Regions:
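Extracellular lectin-like interaction modules
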Residues: 1-511
Length: 511
């Protein structure tokens, strides 16, 4: 039919669609529709609209197929609008069948019904508006679901969207960019591809299936949480993921394990990680993070400005650029901490096990390290900040690389020393000190040096304290005599116990 519009005035009955329907003017169907005898099309041209209300009565059967048939339906308004009314949801009717596939195209597509189901695929070509003027949640179920343009709520309400698919859910446009959705949920099983940029909701975003980023993506929830029950990956191109939540963010499985993200940025009240996170670029966590399992963060750069609760799990930080750990926001309760490369530290960093820093450490603020023992494989630059070491087991301080420019250095546990260790303030070693190489302690112009425990080791020890004091509160060389002792400068020296030196002894102030 061409040249005139088509209007079917129903009263809650069902229109049997057993042929294609087309018009260059508007098509209005005020009935339920049963698709019969094969695949059918409802089309308009010249910008004409298509409206299917589902009927005026209460005996609505929605849009469905004839029982026992596997029919598909195409609704195509071209540049015109498509409206699927509140009583016209895609379903199986009272005694019909689900349609096989449904494709809907239009300049804009309005879906007012709260439920839509097909046995095959849903495809929407054109901007989609969810729901009517009263807040509701729409559930869509299919083998595969595809939105080729934007998805928005009806204006001035916060309608939600649930997508149930065991196959592929592809979203190629922004969600909630014009009118924010209430919530967004995808079920477990299958994959959701986000390829349209931003996703904006008022309440929760819950992704039950695997998420694949096909474009740089920003997920924002004003009041709700954002949760990922399955993996999050890029497609074959590394993508950025920015998350902003007025509540919490949770990752129940790995991020970037199959295809690394370009970057990951988080802002929320808290974030939980149950598996590893891999990016090619920066990971920026301004939110408090909690580990649910042993976790490795790997990427170009890492920033943990919001602090971290290790929940007694191991933490590995493998970043090519220096990782920033800000302990002023609580960075602790970790089992073991391993930092593969360089690190910028400040605040208090607490572990119940070891802390291993494989790269160079730079203090960007006063820093306290607590745990069983610490290892600094490539030295430490204090940048005149204070360093407090509170390790229960022996910790190596190796000045043969760089261990210098520290303000005050205070170690409450046992230490092994070698090389040159330089501070602008005092150096206090509260427990035993063992020399495992020739050692020089330099405290600048006036810093004190004190040893609370014994000092042993068959190596040279030189101390340059300027006008500061040198105090030995326990024996020197009682187990293993020193090779030599050189007290190069000090205002006073106090030795409260015995001194044993194997070779020629030392010289300098106090001797």
């Amino acid at each position: 039919l061409t040249g005139k519009g088509i209007v079917i005035e129903g009263s809650g009955a069902t229109t049997i669609l057993n042929a294609n329907m087309s018009s260059n003017l508007d098509i209005v169907i005020n009935d339920a529709i049963e698709v019969q005898g094969g695949d059918r099309q409802i089309t308009t041209t010249n910008g004409a609209d298509i409206t299917i209300t589902g009927g005026n009565g209460t005996a609505n059967e929605g849009i469905h197929g004839t029982k026992g048939e596997a029919n598909s339906l195409t609704i195509d308004a071209g540049t015109g609008a498509v409206a699927i009314g509140a009583l016209a949801g895609f379903g199986d009717g009272s005694d019909g069948s689900l349609l096989q596939n449904v494709a809907v195209s239009g300049g804009n597509v309005s879906l007012y019904s709260t439920s839509h189901s097909v046995s095959g695929d849903f495809e929407f070509n054109g901007p989609v508006t969810i729901g009517g003027p009263t807040s509701s949640t729409m559930t869509m179920s299919a083998a595969n679901i595809s939105f080729q343009s934007t998805i928005d709520s009806a204006a001035s309400v916060l309608n939600g969207l649930i997508l149930n698919s065991q196959g592929l859910t592809n979203i190629s446009g922004a969600i909630g960019a014009t009118n924010q959705l209430g919530s967004l949920t995808t079920d477990a099983g299958g994959t959701t591809q986000l390829a349209g940029g931003p996703v904006n909701t008022s309440d929760a975003q819950t992704f039950g299936d695997t998420v694949e980023l096909g474009a740089d993506t920003t997920l924002s929830s004003t009041n709700g949480s954002i949760s990922f029950a399955s993996a999050v990956d890029s497609d074959t191109t590394a993508r950025t993921l920015n998350l902003s939540s007025g509540s919490t963010v949770s990752f129940d499985t790995a991020v970037g394990s199959s295809n690394a993200l370009a970057s990951l940025t988080l802002a929320a009240t808290g974030t939980t990680f149950a598996d590893d996170v891999t990016t090619t670029g920066i990971q920026n966590y301004s939110t408090p993070a909690t580990l649910l399992n042993h976790v490795t963060f790997q990427g170009g750069e890492g920033q943990f400005a919001g602090g971290l609760d290790g929940n007694q799990k191991d933490l590995a930080l493998n970043f090519t650029a220096p990782v920033t750990i800000d302990g002023s926001e609580t960075f602790g309760n970790i089992a073991n901490l391993s930092v593969q490369n360089n690190a910028n530290l400040s605040g208090t960093i607490n572990t119940t096990g070891f802390q291993n820093y494989g790269g160079a450490v730079t203090l960007v603020g006063d820093t306290t390290l607590q745990g069983t023992y610490g290892n600094f494989g490539s030295g430490l630059d204090g940048q005149t900040n204070n360093l407090q070491l509170e390790f229960s087991s022996e910790t190596e301080i190796d000045g043969s690389t760089v261990f210098s420019n520290i303000g005050d250095l205070n170690s409450t546990g046992a230490v092994k020393l070698r090389g040159t260790i330089s501070t602008t303030g005092f150096q206090n070693y509260g427990d035993t000190a063992t020399l495992y190489g020739d050692t020089t302690l330099n405290t600048g112009t006036s810093g004190d040096v004190s040893f609370g425990g014994t000092v042993d080791g068959s190596h040279d020890l030189a101390i340059e304290a300027g006008t500061g004091r040198i105090d030995f509160f326990n024996a020197l060389g009682s187990s293993t005599p020193l090779q030599s002792l050189n007290l190069a400068s000090a205002s006073a020296v106090q030795a409260n116990s015995t001194l044993a030196i194997d070779a020629t002894g030392g010289s300098g102030a106090g001797l």
